[in-house]
A protein has these predicted regions:
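Central hydrophobic cores of alpha-helical transmembrane segments
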Residues: 2-5, 302-316, 369
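Secretory targeting signals
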Residues: 7-56, 123-198, 218-298, 333-342
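Long, solvent-exposed extracytoplasmic domains/loops
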Residues: 50-155
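Membrane-interface elements of multi-pass transporters and channels
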Residues: 198, 240-253, 298-302, 306, ...
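Short helix-to-coil transition segments within interhelical loops
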Residues: 207-214
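Hydrophobic alpha-helical transmembrane segments in multi-pass membrane proteins
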Residues: 230-236, 315-322
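Junction motif at the cytosolic side of a transmembrane helix
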Residues: 294-298, 346-371
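Extracellular/periplasmic helix-loop-helix junctions in multi-pass membrane proteins
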Residues: 320-340
Length: 371
C-alpha cells in the first residue's frame, strides 16, 4: 500500500503541483513583477515608505533612459521609425496592426535580453500607481461595519505598505492546496483497511471475545493518528524542499495585507501565514484519519467503505480548498468562519469517537450490526 501511496502522490504532483514548481514565475510579465519586487525588498526592506517610493520613481526614470538609448541606436526599430520609448509606446498602442513591428517587438520581448527593460517599463508604472493609491483602492461597504473597521486598521497600521506580490502568495496557496488534497486522499487510502482487514479475516470476533481485544479499537485509532502525522510530515517536508527552489524566502517577513495582495482579517507576515496553513493541514489530516477509520469500523466491505468515503472526502476536500486553507482569514469571508468550521469538525469527530468507543466496549458478538 505504501508503494501505491507513493505512486498516487507522484501522479497528483505531476498533474497539479509540478506546474507551480517548474514554471514559477509563470511567463511574462509575472517574471518581471517578481524580479522588480525582489529588488525592491533588497533596496527598501519588506516595507516601502514615501521616500523609498520616490527612489523607485528614479529607478523608473533610469529604465526609461536605458530604453531611449536602446531605441535610438537600434537599426531594427529605427527602420520602423522608432527612435524612443515614446515612439515605441505610440506604435504599440496604435489601432493599425503593423506586422513587421509586431514581429520585431516580440522577437526582442521573447528572445533578446535587450527586451527585458521593455517588460520592466510596462510593470513599474503599475507598481508605483498601486502604491500611490494604496489607501484609496478599497471599496466601502456601509452595511459591513467589521469590514470597514478592518480596512481602516490596515491603513492606520500601514500594513498595506508591505511588499508582497500576489503572484508569490497565490503560488504558495496553490501548492499547499494540491499537497493538502494529496495528503487527505493518501490518509483515507492508507487507513481504510485498519478495521476492514480484521473483519474480512473474521479476527474481530476473536477480539470482542476478550477484554484486551475490545481495547484494540482505541489502539488502532492511536496508531492511525500516528500514521497520519508521519504521512503529513513527510509530504510537507517534500513540499517545502520543492518550494525552496522557488526562491521566495525574501517575502517571508512581508505582511500579507500588502497593497499588491489581498486583504485579510489578521495582521500577520507571510511566514506566519505559512505556519498557520501547516497547522491547518495537520488538523485536517487528523480529522480525515478519524473519519476514515470510523467508516472502516462500520463497513463490511471495501466497496461499502469507499462509497461512504467519497462523500466525506468530497466535503473535506471542498472545505479545504475553498475556506480552510486557500481562503484562510481572507476578508471577503466572515471573520470566524474558518475557525468555526475547524471547531465543528473537531467536535463532531470527537463525539463520534467517544460514542463509537463506548459501543465497542458493549458490542455483542452474536448480534453485531455492521453496514
Amino acid at each position: 500500500m505504501v508503494c501505491l501511496l507513493i505512486l498516487g502522490s507522484l501522479i497528483i504532483y505531476k498533474m497539479f503541483s509540478s506546474f507551480e514548481i517548474e514554471f514559477f514565475p509563470n511567463g511574462r510579465p509575472a517574471l518581471d513583477i517578481y524580479k522588480i519586487m525582489v529588488q525592491m525588498i533588497e533596496d527598501y526592506g519588506n516595507d516601502m515608505d514615501e521616500i523609498e517610493l520616490e527612489d523607485l520613481k528614479i529607478v523608473y526614470d533610469n529604465k526609461l533612459k536605458e530604453a531611449n538609448e536602446f531605441f535610438s541606436n537600434n537599426k531594427d526599430f529605427n527602420d520602423l521609425g522608432i527612435y524612443s520609448y515614446e515612439d515605441y509606446e505610440y506604435k504599440n498602442s496604435s489601432d493599425t496592426v503593423d506586422q513587421k513591428f509586431e514581429d520585431t517587438k516580440w522577437n526582442y520581448l521573447l528572445e533578446r535580453k535587450e527586451g527585458n527593460v521593455l517588460w520592466e517599463l510596462q510593470e513599474l508604472p503599475n507598481i508605483i500607481e498601486f502604491y500611490e493609491n494604496r489607501n484609496n483602492r478599497y471599496s466601502v461597504n456601509e452595511g459591513f461595519k467589521k469590514y470597514d473597521e478592518r480596512i481602516n486598521e490596515i491603513i492606520t497600521n500601514r500594513e498595506n505598505e508591505s511588499i508582497l506580490s500576489k503572484i508569490v502568495f497565490d503560488n504558495y496557496n496553490n501548492l499547499i492546496k494540491y499537497f493538502g488534497i494529496c495528503i487527505i486522499i493518501g490518509i483515507a487510502f492508507m487507513l481504510t483497511p485498519v478495521f476492514l482487514k480484521d473483519k474480512k479475516d473474521k479476527i474481530d470476533c476473536l477480539q470482542y471475545a476478550s477484554k484486551h481485544g475490545r481495547k484494540l479499537f482505541k489502539s488502532k485509532l492511536v496508531a492511525g493518528v500516528i500514521s497520519t502525522l508521519i504521512i503529513t510530515t513527510i509530504e510537507l517536508i517534500i513540499l517545502f524542499i520543492l518550494y525552496g527552489g522557488n526562491n521566495t524566502s525574501m517575502f517571508f517577513k512581508s505582511n500579507i495585507n500588502s497593497v499588491f495582495n489581498d486583504e485579510f482579517w489578521v495582521n500577520i507576515t507571510f511566514i506566519q501565514y505559512i505556519g498557520l496553513t501547516v497547522v491547518g493541514i495537520y488538523v485536517i489530516g487528523v480529522i480525515t484519519a478519524f473519519i476514515s477509520m470510523l467508516i472502516s469500523s462500520k463497513a463490511n466491505t471495501y466497496i461499502a467503505s469507499i462509497g461512504m468515503q467519497v462523500l466525506s472526502l468530497f466535503i473535506i476536500v471542498g472545505l479545504t480548498v475553498t475556506i480552510l486553507l486557500n481562503a484562510l482569514f481572507i476578508i471577503y469571508i466572515p471573520k470566524y468562519l474558518a475557525f468555526i468550521i475547524y471547531l465543528a469538525l473537531i467536535v463532531i469527530t470527537v463525539l463520534i469517537i467517544i460514542t463509537s468507543s463506548k459501543k465497542e466496549k458493549i458490542t455483542d458478538i452474536n448480534n453485531e450490526s455492521r453496514i
